[in-house]
Design a protein with these regions (language model features):
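Short secondary-structure junctions
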Residues: 96-102, 256-264, 270-277, 414-425, ...
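A carboxyl-terminal module marker
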Residues: 282-479
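A short, surface-exposed helix-loop junction/capping segment
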Residues: 65-77, 220-237, 383-385
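Class II aminoacyl-tRNA synthetase-like tRNA-binding/catalytic domains
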Residues: 2-10, 38-185, 189-191, 196, ...
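Fungal secretory targeting signals
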Residues: 1-27
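Internal, charge-rich low-complexity segments
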Residues: 191-221, 261-266
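Beta-rich nucleic-acid/ligand-interaction surfaces
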Residues: 103-129, 261-299, 427-436
Length: 479
C-alpha cells in the first residue's frame, strides 16, 4: 500500500520542526544474499528494450525512460556487498527474522500498471499515473514507482505470515541532494488468518505474538489516536492488537538503526550531543490502511519523520483472494536512512563507482558493528548557472497530461544532458506577462562534480547544451 509519508504530512504548529526523512513506499508513499552481483546493462532498439533479461515492446507515445535510468536498472545497489544501501537493508531486515518473514530482494523493476496502480485502488486520474511522474515503457508496462507494486501478489501467494520486499524504485522527481530518479524502499507486512488461529480469535493470537517481541526501553509518545477503524471488517479488539504488534515491531527496528547511528556518531564526532532517543506516533490518513500512523524519532536535535504504516485495507486482501486474512504493513525509504546512518551528504554518492567512496565501507557487510561515517574526499566548488524562458503556452507548471509543461520535464532534460554533474535545480522566479498572459520561468542549476573540480568552461558547455535541449524538447523561448 502506498502510505507515502512524503507529500502527505500533517504539520502541527505546536510541535518542533520535523525533518522529512524517508521516501516511503506506497504503503507506504513505500533469502538475503551478500555477494556482489553482475550488472548486465539494459539493451534496446527502436521498438523494444531489454531489462534484466526481459524484452518489452515500447510504445513511442508512452516510452519516456532515459538512458541513465535504464542503465541504473542493472545496478542493484541494495544487494551490493559493502554498499551503504545494502548494509542498511541488512540492518532493517535483521529485525524481521525468518521463517516468520520471507525476504524478496530480486524482483524485476518492470511491472504492469495493474500491479503498480490498479491492485492498490489508484483512481484512473490519479497524478501518480501521469507521464510527468512515472517512467513508462508502454501504456501497460512501467518501472515500479514503489515496492507496493508487489503487495497484492505477495498476499495472493500466501507463502509466509510476513514478508519484506526490498527493491529499487523509479520516479521522475526534483534534483537536489536528497532526490534521485532511482532510490530504494523496503516494504513489510504481516498477516493473520481467521480460519487458522485458535477459535478464530485473531486478537488473542496477535497479542500472543506481541508478547514474543523484544522490549526496547526507549521512551515512546503514543496519544491514543482517533483513527477510523474498518468497522465492516475488523473489531476494535482486532485493530488494537494489530496496531500494537505493528508499532512494537517497527519501534524495535528504528531503535536498532538509530542506536547504531548514535554509537558511530559518539565514536567519531567529539561534538555530537548525546541525547536520549525518543519516538512518537503521529496519527495519519492513507488510502490503503486504516488506522494509519507515521513514526517520528528525535535524534541529533530534530524530529525526523521515518516511516508510514497501518492496518491493511481489507479490500486489498479480498481482491488478492485471501479474504480471511488481516494484518499490518509498513514502508520505509532505505536511501535516506543510509544517508543518516553513514552521514552521507548527497544521494548521488550512492551511484558513484569511485573507490574513494566504496572502499570506506569494506568489511561492514560481514560485521555490521563496524559501521563508520563517510569521510568526504574533498569539497569541490559549485558552478551555479541560471536559465529563464517563456513557455510555449499559458499552461502552468504542474500539468499532468501529455503535451503540457511539467517541472519534472525540466529536471529530466537537465539530468539527461549533464547527468550526475548536476547537484541541484530550483525554480527561482516565475512571472506572467500582464498583457500577453505568457508565463516566464527561471531556474538556477548548480553544477558540481562529486569526484573532481568542474571548470567554469565545462559548466558553461553543459549549461548551453541544457538551454538548447529545453528549446528542442519543450518548445520554450529562451530569455
Amino acid at each position: 500500500m502506498r502510505l507515502c509519508v512524503q507529500g502527505m504530512r500533517c504539520l502541527r504548529a505546536s510541535t518542533p520542526r520535523i525533518v522529512q526523512l524517508p521516501r516511503s513506499s506506497v504503503l507506504l508513499r513505500t533469502a538475503c544474499a551478500t555477494r556482489a552481483y553482475s550488472s548486465v546493462p539494459p539493451t534496446g532498439s527502436s521498438d523494444s528494450v531489454t531489462i534484466r533479461g526481459q524484452t518489452i515492446k515500447t510504445d513511442p507515445e508512452w516510452f519516456n525512460v532515459p538512458n541513465n535510468v535504464l542503465e541504473a536498472t542493472s545496478r542493484k545497489l541494495h544487494l551490493l556487498k559493502d554498499h551503504p544501501v545494502s548494509i542498511t537493508r541488512q540492518i532493517m531486515q535483521s529485525n524481521f527474522p525468518e521463517p516468520t518473514f520471507k525476504y524478496y530482494n530480486e524482483f524485476s523493476p518492470v511491472v504492469s500498471t495493474k500491479q503498480n496502480f490498479d491492485s492498490l485502488g489508484f483512481p484512473v486520474n490519479h497524478p501518480g499515473r501521469a507521464l510527468s511522474d512515472t517512467y513508462y515503457i508502454n501504456s501497460e508496462t512501467l518501472l515500479r514507482t514503489h515496492t507496493s507494486a508487489h503487495q497484492a501478489d505477495r498476499f495472493r501467494g500466501n507463502e509466509s505470515a510476513g514478508y519484506l520486499v526490498s527493491a529499487d524504485v523509479y520516479r521522475r522527481d526534483a534534483i537536489d541532494r536528497s532526490h534521485y530518479p532511482v532510490f530504494h524502499q523496503m516494504e513489510g507486512a504481516m498477516s493473520w488468518d481467521r480460519t487458522k488461529v485458535p477459535n478464530g480469535d485473531v486478537a488473542a493470537a496477535v497479542w500472543k505474538d506481541f508478547e514474543k517481541l523484544p522490549v526496547h526501553g526507549v521512551k515512546v509518545d503514543d496519544p491514543n489516536p482517533r483513527n477510523p477503524l474498518q468497522d465492516a471488517h475488523h473489531t476494535a479488539a482486532e485493530a488494537e492488537a494489530i496496531g500494537a504488534h505493528l508499532k512494537r515491531s517497527l519501534e524495535n527496528m528504528v531503535v536498532d538503526i538509530f542506536s547504531r547511528a548514535k554509537a558511530t556518531a559518539l565514536k567519531e564526532d567529539p561534538n555530537f550531543v548525546d541525547e536520549p532517543l525518543q519516538m512518537r506516533w503521529v496519527e495519519a490518513y492513507f488510502p490503503f490502511t486504516s488506522p494509519s500512523w507515521e513514526l517520528e524519532v528525535y535524534y541529533a536535535g530534530d524530529w525526523l519523520e521515518v516511516l508510514g504504516c497501518g492496518v491493511v485495507n481489507q479490500d486489498i486482501y479480498i481482491n488478492a483472494g485471501v479474504p480471511n486474512q488481516l494484518g499490518w504493513a509498513f514502508g520505509i525509504g532505505i536511501d535516506r536512512i543510509a544517508m543518516l546512518l553513514f552521514k552521507i551528504p548527497d544521494i548521488r554518492l550512492f551511484w558513484s563507482k569511485d573507490k574513494r567512496f566504496l572502499s570506506q565501507f569494506e568489511g561492514v557487510t560481514d560485521n555490521l558493528d563496524k559501521i563508520k561515517r563517510f569521510v568526504p574526499f574533498s569539497k569541490y566548488p559549485p558552478c551555479p548557472k541560471d536559465v529563464s524562458f517563456w513557455l510555449s503556452s499559458t499552461t502552468a507548471a504542474g500539468g499532468n497530461t501529455k503535451g503540457t509543461f511539467h517541472e519534472n520535464d525540466v529536471m529530466e532534460i537537465v539530468r539527461n544532458v549533464a547527468g550526475d554533474v548536476v547537484e541541484d535545480v530550483r525554480l527561482i522566479d516565475e512571472f506572467t506577462h500582464p498583457k500577453t498572459g505568457r508565463k516566464s520561468m527561471a531556474y538556477r542549476i548548480v553544477y558540481r562534480s562529486l569526484e573532481r573540480t568542474l571548470t567554469n568552461d565545462e559548466a558553461v558547455a553543459f549549461h548551453e547544451d541544457v538551454r538548447q535541449a529545453l528549446v528542442k524538447e519543450l518548445g520554450v523561448e529562451l530569455r
